[in-house]
């Protein structure tokens, strides 16, 4: 089952693009007091084709609350036994999008964003019919943050064999020249 975690703003069209492109079997809506009606409209119009659950934020500008609700959304997706989870950060406030990304990076979630080139000059929003969905790479995977955390834990515990294994794992990644020199020098 693919589950889409969707931040909801007051503009419906890009969210419809995300729903159509991802075609999820389950959707967890992260909505604010102001955007809850948009989530309700989407459920009314499309809810028959997927399971759905809505999490409501009291303060759409609270990064902490957005982070906590995103973790609850992940928990709901896992309760539904999701085999793939996509988190779309198109709608909602900037703190809602940031909280979603902070909570879900490094957890095997694919991120997506509906953008586009043609924008309304007054609002900056993408023009209807000109939307384009983009899949976004989780930067923690590219940067080797999991391996680096494993290295520091092993090093601090004086488990030098494990620390060496984590460094070797980092050295097998596609690294910049300075990263390769740094990790290589640490390995010795």
Predicted features by range, described:
Residues 1-84, 98-188:
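Long, low-complexity, Lys/Arg-enriched
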Residues 83-91:
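Short N-terminal targeting/anchoring amphipathic segment
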């Amino acid at each position: 089952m693919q589950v889409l975690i969707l931040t909801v703003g007051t503009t419906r069209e890009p969210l419809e693009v995300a729903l159509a492109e991802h075609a999820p079997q389950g959707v967890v809506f992260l909505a604010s007091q102001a955007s809850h009606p948009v989530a309700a409209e989407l459920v009314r119009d499309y809810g028959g084709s997927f399971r759905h659950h809505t999490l409501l934020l009291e303060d759409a500008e609270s990064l902490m609350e957005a982070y906590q609700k995103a973790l609850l959304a992940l928990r709901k997706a896992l309760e539904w036994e999701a085999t793939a989870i996509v988190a779309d950060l198109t709608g909602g406030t900037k703190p809602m999008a940031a909280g979603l990304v902070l909570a879900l990076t490094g957890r095997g979630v694919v991120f997506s964003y509906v953008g586009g080139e043609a924008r309304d000059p007054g609002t900056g929003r993408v023009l209807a019919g000109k939307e384009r969905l983009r899949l976004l790479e989780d930067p923690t995977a590219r940067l080797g943050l999991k391996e680096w955390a494993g290295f520091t834990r092993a090093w601090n515990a004086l488990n030098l064999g494990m620390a060496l294994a984590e460094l070797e794992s980092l050295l097998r990644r596609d690294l910049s020249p300075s990263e390769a020199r740094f990790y290589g020098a640490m390995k010795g």
